[in-house]
A protein has these predicted regions:
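Conserved N-terminal phosphate-binding loop of PLP-dependent enzymes in the Aspartate aminotransferase
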Residues: 2-473
Length: 473
């Protein structure tokens, strides 16, 4: 035990030793860490033994819940059998081969039979980095070196590396990092409640979004636009559900101009929406799919990049001339991670957790609508499956948000944590996300509703004081 731990404990050791991701340094030094000591199912415990109902699912990722002995055993056996080997230079091993085959089977079963090959990484960010590079590689191999630009969307979250952070459409992730890179274009956020014009119907809003995308393609030249990247439902941005018809119309535009579609399913994949993948939910036919989080339920860092037969054919045909695909990571297809993923997928299937996400998601959303939708500071309750948000509004009738600096949703999130409920405030709009493990029960949904109602009531006096602090109408 270090002298620091003996003298001060974990709280001070944390402040002295850790640089936390996505954390205010000055606030952290004042208040210290929020330490979690254990987890089981949907429940976390802090060092004092206090229980916290985790309706954030870690970071949208603990799909099968905490403390699964089957996954611990899978990790143990994999470590004992083959603790590591790589996939470079035609090397392989059974766990990676079997996982790739199983993932393709899951997608094909859902109708995405055009997906052909699997590449492994370690995080959602690097999966989108891989997509970024493959788009360039693909068009270079086709003799189209000018076709490199990627369209993303305001409010999107695609990661924090230089490439994936550029694709992210939230300004806070760009500030002081000299992002985004040239060649990344952000179009309007498809969130009707917040961004529709006064009197604009959802159909008219969708028209405007598609017209804007077509105008960007015309302005930049379709010969320069390589891909469009989209989360089927935008997670970190605030659980932003697209307007009806958005994706069918978008795909038609992209097809017309030979533009690839990258589906970022890092959050939506592996049952979160009540279907295995959002490609099935929205009838998407993406050329690249980025996955992570739920593939191992965060028991091991692993990501997946699926590519279409269309892309594979170009790579295969060019191989004699260009040589190896010079992209990969030491831990691509790690045998321990792949072994955990295979058991994790079996748990999702055997316990019916995808169907449970659909059923419990509908129950939780209905409960939120019934119990808080009429609250004067709740603008909208929305979502699909176990991906739900409550958006706050200073003036719900006119859809006027609280001033960003006021942090109204963070106040509610902090009150929720005090009451024993963990939910996540968005860094883009004043929305609170509910994304519990897919094993959540009806009783746990009821408890989360009770805790949230109590937290919102406790926060209301502060929201009253802030309601005069509004963003411009």
């Amino acid at each position: 035990m270090s002298e620091l731990l003996k003298n001060y404990g974990l709280d001070e050791m944390d402040r002295q030793s850790l640089l936390h991701p996505l954390t205010s340094i000055v606030d952290h030094q004042k208040s210290g860490p929020r330490i979690i000591s254990s987890g089981s199912g949907v429940t976390l415990k802090d060092p004092s033994g206090r229980s916290i109902l985790d309706c954030s699912g870690g970071l949208w990722c603990v799909n099968v819940g905490y403390g699964r002995p089957e996954l611990a055993e899978a990790a143990k056996q994999a470590i004992l059998e083959l603790s590591f080997f790589h996939l470079f230079s035609s090397s392989s091993h059974a766990p990676a081969i079997q996982l790739a085959d199983r993932l393709l089977s899951l997608f094909h079963r859902g109708g995405a039979t055009h997906l052909s090959k699997v590449f492994f990484g370690t995080s959602g960010s690097d999966a989108n980095d891989t997509a970024f590079k493959l788009v360039r590689y693909y068009n270079n191999l086709r003799g189209l070196p000018a076709k490199k630009k990627i369209i993303s969307r305001e409010g999107a979250y695609h990661g924090v590396t230089v490439a994936s952070g550029s694709l992210t459409g939230i300004a806070a992730y760009h500030k002081a990092f000299d992002l985004p890179l040239p060649g990344v274009i952000h179009t309007s956020c498809p969130h009707y409640f917040r961004f529709a014009n006064d009197g604009e119907s959802e159909a008219d809003f969708c028209d405007r979004l598609i017209n804007e995308i077509e105008a960007i393609i015309a302005r930049e030249g379709p010969e320069t636009i390589a891909a469009f990247i989209a989360e089927p439902i935008m997670g970190t941005g605030g659980v932003l559900v697209p307007p009806a018809g958005y994706f069918s119309r978008l795909q038609a535009v992209l097809k017309e101009h030979d533009i690839l579609l990258i589906a970022d399913e890092v959050i939506t994949g592996f049952g979160r929406l009540g279907t295995w993948f959002a490609t099935e939910f929205y009838d998407l036919k993406p050329d690249i799919v980025s996955l992570a989080k739920g593939v191992t339920s965060a028991y091991f860092p692993m990501s997946v990049s699926m590519i279409s037969e269309r892309i594979w054919q170009v790579l295969e045909q060019a191989s004699p001339d260009v040589g190896p695909v010079m992209h990969g990571f030491t831990y691509s297809g790690h045998p321990v991670g792949a072994s955990i993923a295979l058991v994790n997928l079996s748990i999702l299937e055997d316990e019916g957790l995808v169907a449970n996400a659909a059923n419990m998601g509908a129950y939780l959303k209905a409960g939120l609508k019934d119990r808080v939708a009429d609250h004067r500071f709740v603008g909208e309750v929305r979502g699909e499956g176990l991906m739900i948000a409550v958006e706050l509004s200073a003036d719900k009738d006119r859809r006027i948000p609280f001033a960003r600096a006021a942090g109204a949703h963070r106040i509610v999130a902090n009150k929720a944590f005090e009451h024993g409920l963990l939910i996540r405030p968005s860094p883009f709009i004043e929305a609170l996300a509910f994304s519990p493990p897919l094993c959540i029960t009806k009783d746990e949904c009821d408890r989360s509703l009770d805790l949230f109602v109590a937290a919102l009531a406790a926060a209301t006096p502060e929201l009253d004081a802030l309601s005069g602090s509004r963003a411009a109408a």
